[in-house]
Regions:
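N-terminal ligand-binding lobe of clamshell/alpha-beta domains
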Residues: 1-258
Length: 258
């Protein structure tokens, strides 16, 4: 089978199921596991290079209002790769090529490939996404084995975290200007690991915050995971954040747990 992944997490899922040799194309953001970046890239961003967090936010909001694209899909390369299956998502048009664009592209190919849309909002649904991928690729039993291994790992973490005497208040931030909480399964992961996350909601999208909400929450641990940014870029954005003056008021900063 010839598989094209239009989502970094889907690329990892394909490999988790042992189907890496079937992968023929990925996105410009796929970088794990090692070696996938050598595969043909089928996407590129339409956002200007070097734009700040606030500038990116404005551009994204404007384009979503007008149904404008955030990514470009290389139709010619897609045609050359002749995929049997395209794995994508319809959960968030900010995170990847819009599902409607993928559907139109697939229909334009000489041999229309199957499309698998992944839309998990909770950890259980992430495992269901693996199950769907295993089913469509003809290895449902192996997918169940992989899910079993992952489930046992989660159970081990939960079991150990229950022994923690103090559960720390956590702020998990997905964007800095404006501030965004975490969402979907991330608050769930924090709770499973022994933290308390109340700025984001399990199964719900991330939402905009203001610094007063963060200060009122008084987080003892802060995770910063800006969507699409690597560590150096995240640190750069943090140093220029409008809320940096509020940091001394946060317990997590005082204890160095950021």
């Amino acid at each position: 089978m010839r598989i094209v992944s239009l989502l970094p997490s889907a690329t990892e899922m394909v490999h988790a199921l042992g189907l890496g040799s079937d992968l023929v194309g990925v996105t410009h953001e796929c970088d794990f596991p090692l070696g996938v970046e050598e595969l043909p890239h089928l996407t590129s961003t339409l956002l200007p290079e070097g734009a700040s967090s606030s500038e990116i936010d404005v551009l994204v909001r404007e384009r979503l209002k007008t149904d404008g694209a955030l990514y470009e899909l290389d139709l010619e390369e897609l045609k050359n790769l002749e995929p049997d299956l395209i794995v994508t998502q319809a959960l968030c048009d900010v995170c990847a090529v819009a599902e409607s664009e993928v559907q139109a592209a697939a229909c334009s190919l000489p041999n229309t490939p199957a499309i698998l849309n992944l839309e998990p909002e909770t950890l259980a649904e992430v495992f269901d996404a693996l199950r769907q991928l295993g089913s469509v690729t003809g290895i449902p039993d192996h997918a169940e084995d992989v899910i079993g291994v992952l489930t046992r790992r989660v159970d081990t973490v939960v079991s150990r975290s229950q022994a923690v005497q103090k559960r720390h208040k956590v702020a998990f931030l997905e964007w800095l200007d404006p501030l965004f909480s975490c969402g979907h399964w991330t608050p769930e992961l924090v709770e499973m690991a022994g933290g308390i996350e109340r700025l984001g909601q399990v199964g719900q999208p991330s939402r905009t915050l203001d610094w007063m909400e963060v200060i009122a929450w008084q987080p003892e641990v802060i995770f910063i995971a800006c969507c699409g940014f690597d560590l150096p870029r995240t640190l750069e954005e943090l140093s220029g954040s409008s809320g940096i003056s509020c940091w001394p008021e946060l317990p997590a900063v005082e204890s160095g747990r950021v």
